Protein backbone atom coordinates (compact mmCIF):
# COMPACT_ATOMS: atom_id res chain seq x y z
CA UNK A 1 0.00 0.00 0.00
CA UNK A 2 1.14 3.56 -0.62
CA UNK A 3 1.10 4.52 3.07
CA UNK A 4 3.87 1.94 3.65
CA UNK A 5 6.10 3.77 1.14
CA UNK A 6 5.67 7.24 2.67
CA UNK A 7 8.56 7.98 4.97
CA UNK A 8 7.76 11.55 6.07
CA UNK A 9 4.77 13.15 7.67
CA UNK A 10 3.88 16.83 7.68
CA UNK A 11 5.06 16.91 11.30
CA UNK A 12 8.46 15.40 10.36
CA UNK A 13 8.95 18.09 7.73
CA UNK A 14 7.90 20.85 10.12
CA UNK A 15 10.25 19.73 12.88
CA UNK A 16 13.27 19.07 10.66
CA UNK A 17 16.34 21.04 11.79
CA UNK A 18 19.14 21.80 9.38
CA UNK A 19 22.70 22.45 10.42
CA UNK A 20 24.25 25.59 9.05
CA UNK A 21 27.82 25.98 8.00
CA UNK A 22 29.99 28.98 7.42
CA UNK A 23 28.36 29.80 4.10
CA UNK A 24 25.19 27.81 4.69
CA UNK A 25 21.74 28.26 3.35
CA UNK A 26 19.43 31.19 3.94
CA UNK A 27 17.32 29.95 6.77
CA UNK A 28 14.28 32.08 5.90
CA UNK A 29 14.21 30.78 2.30
CA UNK A 30 14.40 27.15 3.46
CA UNK A 31 11.66 27.73 6.03
CA UNK A 32 9.32 29.22 3.40
CA UNK A 33 10.01 26.31 1.08
CA UNK A 34 9.37 23.79 3.86
CA UNK A 35 6.09 25.57 4.67
CA UNK A 36 5.01 25.13 1.04
CA UNK A 37 5.97 21.46 1.16
CA UNK A 38 3.99 20.96 4.38
CA UNK A 39 0.87 22.56 2.89
CA UNK A 40 1.11 20.39 -0.22
CA UNK A 41 1.81 17.30 1.84
CA UNK A 42 -1.24 17.93 4.04
CA UNK A 43 -3.41 18.54 0.96
CA UNK A 44 -2.21 15.30 -0.61
CA UNK A 45 -2.83 13.41 2.62
CA UNK A 46 -6.36 14.82 2.87
CA UNK A 47 -7.07 13.94 -0.78
CA UNK A 48 -5.64 10.46 -0.25
CA UNK A 49 -7.90 9.84 2.75
CA UNK A 50 -10.97 11.05 0.84
CA UNK A 51 -10.13 8.75 -2.06
CA UNK A 52 -9.66 5.80 0.30
CA UNK A 53 -13.10 6.45 1.79
CA UNK A 54 -14.66 6.81 -1.64
CA UNK A 55 -12.98 3.61 -2.80
CA UNK A 56 -14.28 1.71 0.23
CA UNK A 57 -17.80 3.08 -0.33
CA UNK A 58 -17.76 2.12 -4.01
CA UNK A 59 -16.53 -1.38 -3.16
CA UNK A 60 -19.40 -1.79 -0.68
CA UNK A 61 -21.92 -0.61 -3.28
CA UNK A 62 -20.48 -3.00 -5.85
CA UNK A 63 -20.73 -5.92 -3.45
CA UNK A 64 -24.32 -4.97 -2.60
CA UNK A 65 -25.21 -4.86 -6.28
CA UNK A 66 -23.53 -8.20 -6.93
CA UNK A 67 -25.44 -9.72 -4.03
CA UNK A 68 -28.73 -8.23 -5.25
CA UNK A 69 -28.07 -9.52 -8.77
CA UNK A 70 -27.51 -13.07 -7.54
CA UNK A 71 -30.71 -12.99 -5.50
CA UNK A 72 -32.95 -11.97 -8.41
CA UNK A 73 -34.52 -15.09 -9.92
CA UNK A 74 -33.60 -15.54 -13.52
CA UNK A 75 -36.71 -15.32 -15.66
CA UNK A 76 -36.71 -16.46 -19.25
CA UNK A 77 -36.61 -13.61 -21.68
CA UNK A 78 -39.75 -13.46 -23.74
CA UNK A 79 -39.46 -12.14 -27.23
CA UNK A 80 -42.39 -10.03 -28.27
CA UNK A 81 -44.70 -11.65 -30.80
CA UNK A 82 -44.98 -9.64 -33.95
CA UNK A 83 -48.36 -8.00 -34.06
CA UNK A 84 -49.84 -6.92 -37.36
CA UNK A 85 -49.46 -3.23 -37.82
CA UNK A 86 -52.41 -1.27 -39.10
CA UNK A 87 -51.11 2.09 -40.16
CA UNK A 88 -53.92 2.97 -42.50
CA UNK A 89 -55.01 6.52 -42.24
CA UNK A 90 -58.43 7.82 -43.15
CA UNK A 91 -57.19 9.06 -46.50
CA UNK A 92 -55.76 5.66 -47.36
CA UNK A 93 -59.06 4.01 -46.48
CA UNK A 94 -61.03 6.56 -48.55
CA UNK A 95 -58.76 6.02 -51.56
CA UNK A 96 -59.16 2.27 -51.34
CA UNK A 97 -62.93 2.63 -50.98
CA UNK A 98 -63.05 4.93 -53.99
CA UNK A 99 -61.04 2.47 -56.08
CA UNK A 100 -63.33 -0.38 -55.05
CA UNK A 101 -66.43 1.67 -55.93
CA UNK A 102 -64.98 2.48 -59.33
CA UNK A 103 -64.18 -1.16 -59.89
CA UNK A 104 -67.63 -2.37 -58.83
CA UNK A 105 -69.94 0.40 -60.00
CA UNK A 106 -67.86 1.58 -62.89
CA UNK A 107 -68.20 -1.73 -64.67
CA UNK A 108 -72.00 -1.68 -64.13
CA UNK A 109 -72.29 1.79 -65.62
CA UNK A 110 -70.77 0.65 -68.89
CA UNK A 111 -72.98 -2.44 -69.25
Swiss-Prot record:
Transmembrane segments: none
Gene Ontology CC, one term: cytoplasm
InterPro entries named among the record's database cross-references: Cell_cycle_GpsB, DivIVA_domain, DivIVA_fam
Residue stretches in coiled coil: 38-72
GO biological process: cell division; regulation of cell shape
Compartments reported by the entry: Cytoplasm
Top-level taxonomic group: Bacteria
Keywords for this protein: Cell cycle, Cell division, Cell shape, Coiled coil, Cytoplasm
Keyword Cytoplasm (UniProt): yes
Keyword Coiled coil: yes
Principal location: cytoplasm
HAMAP family associated with the record: GpsB
Subunit structure: Forms polymers through the coiled coil domains. Interacts with PBP1, MreC and EzrA.
Biological role stated in the UniProt entry: Divisome component that associates with the complex late in its assembly, after the Z-ring is formed, and is dependent on DivIC and PBP2B for its recruitment to the divisome. Together with EzrA, is a key component of the system that regulates PBP1 localization during cell cycle progression. Its main role could be the removal of PBP1 from the cell pole after pole maturation is completed. Also contributes to the recruitment of PBP1 to the division complex. Not essential for septum formation.
Family under the similarity heading: Belongs to the GpsB family.
Matching PANTHER family: CELL CYCLE PROTEIN GPSB, CELL DIVISION PROTEIN DIVIVA
Name the record gives this protein: Cell cycle protein GpsB
Organism this protein belongs to: Bacillus cereus (strain ATCC 10987 / NRS 248)
